[in-house]
Amino acid sequence: MTRLSGYLLPTEKEAPADAEAISHKLMVRAGLVRQVGSGLWTWLPAGWRVHQRVTAIVREEIDAIGGQEMLMPVIQPAELWRRSGRYEIEELFKLEDRRGADLVLAG
């Protein structure tokens, strides 16, 4: 672990053994992200700053063409996913609310 300009930078000398994608290897070695489980990632301080900068650039470009940003809920009605044909995906996390309505974790 290194401190660079007051930021925690937990770099790794070796790429994770299970890493297949070059981007995965590089981001872990650079101390940008840490995998905490299958498909679960933690943004480390330097990585979160990069994420915020990229988001700002995308936001500027959207504004420049007159676009509008929106935010959708992470938990969505399953009907949206059924209509798009994506509801039957095996890995999709499905749940039910207290009234029995089908929902999907859209994350």
Positions of the model-derived regions?
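TRNA-recognition modules of translation machinery and tRNA-sensing kinases, especially anticodon-binding
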Residues: 1-107
